[in-house]
Regions:
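Structural motif
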Residues: 36-39, 62-63, 83-85, 105, ...
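Electropositive phosphate-/nucleotide-binding environments in soluble metabolic enzymes
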Residues: 16-23, 48, 52, 66-69, ...
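Active-site loop/helix belt of alpha/beta enzymes
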Residues: 10, 44-59, 102, 114-129, ...
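Functionally critical, mid-to-C-terminal surface segments that flank or help form catalytic/ligand
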Residues: 243-293
Length: 303
């Protein structure tokens, strides 16, 4: 990132965040899921894009979804009055009072969290909205289907408003197991007859599985203008706009002969005599050293 000293930028590299692209991508979610409400996922300080920019660009969302309760504190302190979902719930029982004060919705994914909420409800009259997470095949967080209904009834009996959530493992891939259809079928069978809204779809499901959206969608990567597949064609076809723009300057030029090599390990070999530009940007700036060759670069703003 560029920084200032005595009014000058010492290095020309700069990451620019375009909040209007945030709004464009959020509108795209609304076009694809017009009947669903939106949890905009901004975990890890909006994936490095800064909460300030996310709050400005995504301020028309129905709710923000994040990981750390201290990030929920930040949102409230900066004027966000809408809903906040803690995607992994609480990590410690002593966070319950703060979560209640902040009016957070909680994901519940394990027995310990159910225990905490039962104990808390016995001592307090206020209620949380709870999204009970089902493990339908991703095998990360959530109750297996055979334990899910028991957890639901415990929370429901304690007086909580309980909603239903799962997460797709392969919404961005065809022919991989578990499939979106298989996970969705298992989810629907398990919650049959239970009250509460549903939340299933991540970015990939919003883009390519619009029969699996649910009442609340949870876009993450697509809000930032990237595709879940990592393919530029999918970004273009989905009409997304990149929120972050990385720019720098060419600070030197090297003249190469055929056979000269460039970079660590000599990974690029000149096939003919050529000139190459050296850009002020490297992995110390956050650009991955393992990034593949061939990344498109615009010189002189694409002129």
């Amino acid at each position: 990132m560029g920084y200032t000293a005595n009014g000058l930028i010492n290095r020309p590299i700069l990451a620019s965040i375009h909040t209007e692209a945030f709004q464009h991508n959020l509108n795209r979610v609304r076009e694809l899921a017009p009947e669903s409400k939106i949890w905009s996922v901004i975990k890890a300080r909006a994936y490095g894009h800064a909460f300030e920019a996310a709050l400005k660009g995504l301020g028309s969302t129905d709710g923000f979804a994040l990981l750390d309760i201290q990030d929920a504190v930040w949102l409230r302190e900066h004027g966000w009055q809408g809903r906040i979902l803690l995607l992994e719930g609480l990590f410690h029982e002593n966070e319950l009072e703060l979560a209640q004060e902040l009016a957070c919705d909680l994901v519940v994914h394990c027995d310990a969290q159910v225990d905490w909420l039962e104990t808390f409800k016995a001592k307090n009259h206020n209620k949380f909205n709870v999204f009970l997470k089902m493990n339908t095949g991703m095998n990360r967080l959530g109750f297996k289907p055979d334990a899910y209904r028991t957890a639901f009834h415990r929370l429901h009996s304690a007086g909580y408003q309980v909603h239903h959530m799962t997460h797709f493992a392969n919404a961005d891939q065809v022919g991989h197991e578990p499939s979106v259809g298989g996970q969705q079928e298992l989810f629907n069978q398990t919650i049959s007859g239970l009250p509460g809204s549903t939340s299933l779809a991540n970015s990939a499901a919003i883009l390519w599985h619009r029969n699996a959206l649910g009442d609340w969608v949870r876009p993450g990567i697509m809000l930032y203008g990237a595709s879940p597949t990592g393919l530029y064609a999918d970004i273009a076809h989905s009409h997304l706009k990149a929120v972050m723009q990385l720019s720098s300057e060419i600070i030197d030029i090297q003249e190469l002969k055929k056979g000269d090599r460039v970079g660590y390990g000599g990974r690029y070999e000149a096939q003919e005599s050529m000139r190459i530009g050296i850009v002020a940007c490297g992995y110390a700036d956050g650009y991955p050293r393992q990034a593949k060759d061939g990344t498109p670069v615009w010189v002189n703003k694409g002129a």
